[in-house]
Each structure stands twice: as C-alpha cells, then as structure tokens.
Amino acid sequence: MDETKSELLRKYEQKFKALADQKRLEIMYELCQRGKTCVCDLTEIFEVTQSKLSYHLKILLDANLITKETKGTWSYYDLNDEEVNGLLSEELCCIFRKKGEGDCC
C-alpha cells in the first residue's frame, strides 16, 4: 500500500474512532439540530463537567467532524457538514472496491 493510501486510511480511522462513542454521537446530533452552540450550553444539555465535555469535543475536532469558533472567553461548536456528509463518500467506497469493478477515483 502506498503512502498516500495509507495516509487516507489513517484519516478515516481517526474519524471512525471519533464516531465510535455514544456520547460523541449525541454531541454531533445536538450540533446538527441546534447549529453553532456555546460550550456552556452543551455542558447543561449533557449534564457533564466542562472538562469531560472538552475531552469529547477535542476528539471530534481532531477528526475534523466539528468546528470551533472562539468569541471572547466562550467557544462555539458546530457540525462540520462538509466533512460529515463526505464521510461515506465515493472516495471511501472506492478504497474498498474490488479490482475489476471499474474505476472511480
């Protein structure tokens, strides 16, 4: 496997690991429903400490599944629609396409 494909698979591994947690899926769902949301509101919604919530938000940020905007002392998070919508994209499907089943990438 060449380095490019290896890097691509690592990128998807990080995203799927981030999604492999119910709390993070719940966070993403709330952001999808609410749009840009202050971390202070998220702590109330999920009834967790800010440090525990920050742990999950960092994993989602590192996987590029959410975005963060800082205004003053508060951080606002939103779903990265483009990244989430492309997660099960043609690109990923092509990686696992059997040889001889046509070109797609």
From Swiss-Prot:
Keywords annotated in UniProt: Arsenical resistance, DNA-binding, Repressor, Transcription, Transcription regulation
Domain HTH arsR-type residues, every copy: 4-99
Record-level Gene Ontology MF annotations: DNA binding; DNA-binding transcription factor activity
DNA-binding region: 39-62
Cited InterPro entries: ArsR-like_HTH, ArsR_HTH, HTH_ArsR_DNA-bd_dom, HTH_MetalResp_TranReg, WH-like_DNA-bd_sf, WH_DNA-bd_sf
Database matches in PROSITE patterns: HTH_ARSR_1, HTH_ARSR_2
A Pfam family that the UniProt record links to this protein: HTH_5
Alphabetized SUPFAM superfamilies for the sequence: Winged helix' DNA-binding domain
GO terms of biological process kind: regulation of DNA-templated transcription; response to arsenic-containing substance
NCBIfam families listed in its UniProt record: HTH_metalloreg (NF033788)
Stated role: Transcriptional repressor for the ars operon.
Protein name according to UniProt: Arsenical resistance operon repressor
Origin species: Bacillus subtilis (strain 168)
